[in-house]
């Protein structure tokens, strides 16, 4: 299921003591709005002394990319729990959208570090200029004269019958 970006707004339930409680807003990456609300309560309980039973969700909206046809560089600050402890990491990705960059990050963290989505906390994600990129993997695409190999350009017509026997010996 693809990842979407949500903005979740919530607060404490108003009481006689506090008629206008403080409002909290978070931008979260999740597959569904239900999962985003769940992550909102998870992070809010870590930051403020509040939980789902004493709070209310005011609004959940999906955030869409302004220019989804333009390739951008994204810097992602994350914190994740591994078998040996908690680590802070900065990673860079090139993608069309923030959600695409986060999907790349989740795939890479799962393959390289065996870190699952539940153990990864995205602290910040920013669109960064080409001059501010740090990683060589991202910088290699900033060349204006970059060339890629164009493979299998000639379409070869295959005949119905072939004059020689098939080769079954492969090294």
UniProtKB/Swiss-Prot annotation:
GO CC annotation: cytosolic large ribosomal subunit
Gene3D superfamilies listed in its UniProt record: 3.10.20.10
Keyword Transport: no
Any one GO biological process: cytoplasmic translation
Keywords for the protein's UniProt record, in alphabetical order: Ribonucleoprotein, Ribosomal protein
Keyword Zinc-finger listed: no
MF-aspect GO terms: structural constituent of ribosome
Database matches in InterPro entries: Ribosomal_eL20, Ribosomal_eL20_dom, Ribosomal_eL20_eukaryotes
Pfam families: Ribosomal_L18A (PF01775)
Family listed: Belongs to the eukaryotic ribosomal protein eL20 family.
The protein, known as: Large ribosomal subunit protein eL20
Classification lineage: Eukaryota, Amoebozoa, Evosea, Eumycetozoa, Dictyostelia
